[in-house]
Amino acid sequence: MNIYEFLKKMRRLINEGNRRFVMKRDGRYYYNILIEDFGISDTKAWEYIKTLNEHFLWVDMKPNYTDSSAFIFKRLINGVMAYIKVKIEEGENGEEVVCISFHRDY
């Protein structure tokens, strides 16, 4: 799936409510990371994710994973550079958008 197909499908699935965050990063819940790093709620984070486009796409030249189905984006949110990794996968109720990472870029 190319980036344009991915973004179109991602937005549709998010609008349908077929979305979720991974539960934790480094032992911290994403709800807390979003508030601490950006001052936003999980609902606002999904709004930011829906506005991602090909101009925010970031290509990792040394990926730590081989799963090519995830796309990485970087964008400013409230003055802080965010690292956002999302993919579409099969969930219990069909396809869903999974936000693997949404945190301050290091």
Task: Please provide the spans of the model-predicted regions.
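Enriched for short, Lys/Arg-rich terminal
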Residues: 81-106
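Compact soluble domain cores
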Residues: 1-67
